[in-house]
Amino acid sequence: MKTTRILTLCLMALVGLTGLTTERAAAQKKEKVILDTDMVEVFDDGVAMMMLAKAPNIDLLGVTIVIGNTWVPEGTAYGIRQLECVNRTDIPIVPGIRQPIYPNRFETIKNERILFGIGDAYVGAAGYPEPASWRAVYLQKYGREPSTEPLDMKAVNFIIDRVKANPGEVTILAIGTCVNLATAVRIAPEIVPLIKRVIYMGGSFFRPGNTTPTAEFNWWLDPEAAKICVRTPFKEQVIVGLDVCEKMAFRKDRYERITNLVRNEGIKGMMKRNYLNVKFLEEPTYTHYVWDVIAASILIDPTLIREEVKRYVDVNSQFGFSYGQALAFDSNQPVGSQPARIILTVDEPRLWSMIEKYCSEF
């Protein structure tokens, strides 16, 4: 009897230790992520960030802001406010590089589009003046004082430091222009083998571009930075481009459903005043896409990927008709180009379910 009790107690202790070990292992398995983004309110960079902040399997180390959809001061303000709304002010927002690599890039855009043609009239931050400061944007937009501030550090240094502190563990999710990451690997090339993987939202390999007939917006705005990145010998590169993103339409009924799911009044207000809501009200048949959210979703759950190809990739940085075009090579690739996984199809019903689930937690 005594022996049986001792054995029982030993087994209970062993089970308890196993449970603790399992919990610790689960915590250790969290994917460490740096989100590098040209932040906007809600769709789609904002939703991508908030999903990562809520995902139980993601450890979002920080959000680095880059030029692109918005100016860096704007992106900084939007990032801070949205993390406040989802109670994740522990995640640092880190302002990054304010201009593309090419000198006077924004000044060339008007003539470039006259000479080479356009797809979409949208040019992001290139279409209006840079705000004075992130705080000015925040106060003007939200009419209140922020509860936190951006990290007093440059985004490039943040990327370098966090990668070195977590060798082989950090995934970079680059959903804006690539100038922060490109600069980081040029300044500190020793971090390249230490990065677990890079996932990009950018490029269009097997279909037309959106900003020009050949180029997707993120890589068109800073082709030089995109080229540096995709030619860097990272352990793994995954590209979520227009090839997959523009198969997944975002329409008025779904936008309204998601708006109704959101609980936080701050986020709900952003959804209601967002340009997309205005566009859907003016043009109910309008179709939009959720580019960056797809990239974040396949990071959270890679089983969402249904079809992909592996190719050597490059970016055309020659100023001309195909400036910023993403290029894929099955063989006979240019010297220096690197292999990448190009995502072509995702499980759309499951992905929408995931988006709606996370939005209901905002």
Residue ranges and their predicted role:
Residues 100, 150-158, 264-274:
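Secondary-structure junction/capping motif
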Residues 29-30, 50-59, 220-227, 231, ...:
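Conformational coupling and interaction surfaces
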Residues 84-87, 98, 360:
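Generic short alpha-helical segment signal, independent of protein family or function
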Residues 1-28:
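Bacterial Sec-dependent N-terminal signal peptides
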Residues 28-84, 88, 104, 129-247, ...:
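Active-site histidine-anchored catalytic micro-motif
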Residues 91-142, 146:
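Surface-exposed loop and adjacent secondary-structure segments within mature catalytic domains
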Residues 61-62, 91-95, 342:
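Short N-terminal amphipathic alpha-helices
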Residues 79-82, 110-112, 256-257:
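Short, hinge-like loop/turn segments at secondary-structure boundaries
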